[in-house]
Amino acid sequence: MALAATRAAQLTTTGLESLGWTDAEAAQVAAHAHVARVFAVHRSDIEVRGPQGLDRIDRATAGGLDGVAVGDWLELTDGGGVARILERRNAITRKAAGEHVHRQVLSANVDRLLIVTSCNQEFSLRRLERYLVLACDCDVTPEIVLTKADLTDQVAGYADQAASLLAGVPVHAVDARSAEQVGALVASLRLGETLALIGSSGVGKSTLGNAIGAPNLETGAIRKLDDKGRHTTTVRAMFPLPSGALLIDNPGIRELQLTDCERGISRVFADVLSLAERCQFQDCQHGAEPGCAVREAIADGRLPARRLESLQDLRTEQARNAEILESKRQRARDIGHKYRKLNWSKRAKRGQ
Ligand SMILES: Nc1nc2c(ncn2[C@@H]2O[C@H](COP(=O)(O)OP(=O)(O)OP(=O)(O)O)[C@@H](O)[C@H]2O)c(=O)[nH]1
Ligand SMILES: [Mg+2]
Ligand SMILES: [Zn+2]
């Protein structure tokens, strides 16, 4: 509750707008409906905040909270129960994870997704591309925050590489521990705007959160050997900032695998795909085919070869994950079918 008290103290405006309420939510409920926004999701309860302040809802007794995510809006019953989760404007949904493919909503109703990466061994264009695809696929505007700018004299090089991945993507290079260096980011924050931080463990998401005004997020040292973090943040939670914006700090992501993100891919790889439209063959694989506009662009330096490789790798990975997902669904269908058959034969035996 100490955490909840700190958050309560930080909220300066009590109106729903300060919690991120928009016309999209207003259109879904009656004018005097009771609503609250989800600030943290725990195993047994959730923390919500509405015009009346902070509250905790027990998941078992409330019901109706399956799949609830930080950032969701809830319509409450007169008795304080949960009537329903309002339709989301958008959701950062992780559709696949390593061997176990599943869908997981990381943050809901997000205005700005800050993809955090560091100027050290963690920096990877491939990884950044994945995060950008995820953001674009979820219809959220991405921004890149390059932390640990103080640890390199190559900041401009890192920033240029990051910016080259998606036309117009803002890149903020900072020492995330410095309130002064994050000043421009803070100045851009608006009342009721929801920001979410995602990235690997140890890149400085919580450090950045603290610098932009979140109340004392826990941070932890990284391993010297490989710059990997130790998964310090374990709970997804949202915090009001002094600027009036809301910040969702996420735990570090181990490995971001993608499936079913074709829309995101088509946006992030628009450069490769628009060249591909000019290939002589419609089904060109951009290998040895004659008249390949993609190969031509690579040969004369207009397109970095790694962009094509990235696109092809992501497509292969998507296809593999889609297969795993489909075989899981099939297995679930088979089990459901067997179960129904068993129940049916039991009832038949009992003569029901
Ligand atoms: N030098 C330097 N250190 C930083 C910077 N940002 C973060 N750190 C340090 O990096 C370590 C990890 O920072 P965290 O904020 O805990 O990282 P995180 O992304 O929240 O990690 P998880 O919660 O594990 O996902 C801490 O020791 C921070 O002090 C930076 O810009 N410069
Ligand atoms: Mg953290
Ligand atoms: Zn081609």
Regions found by a protein language model. Name each.
Residues 1-14, 32, 66-81, 85-112, ...:
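Helix-rich effector regions associated with P-loop NTPase G domains
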Residues 32-42:
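Structural detector for short beta-strands of small beta-barrel domains
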Residues 44-48:
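Short aromatic-glycine-enriched beta-strand elements
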Residues 54-70:
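Beta-strand/loop nucleic-acid-binding surfaces
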Residues 78-82, 121, 201:
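Short, charged beta-turn/beta-strand-edge "cap" motif at the junction between a beta-strand
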Residues 126-136, 141:
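Histidine-anchored nucleotide/phosphate-binding helix
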Residues 141, 148-203:
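Canonical P-loop GTPase G-domain recognition
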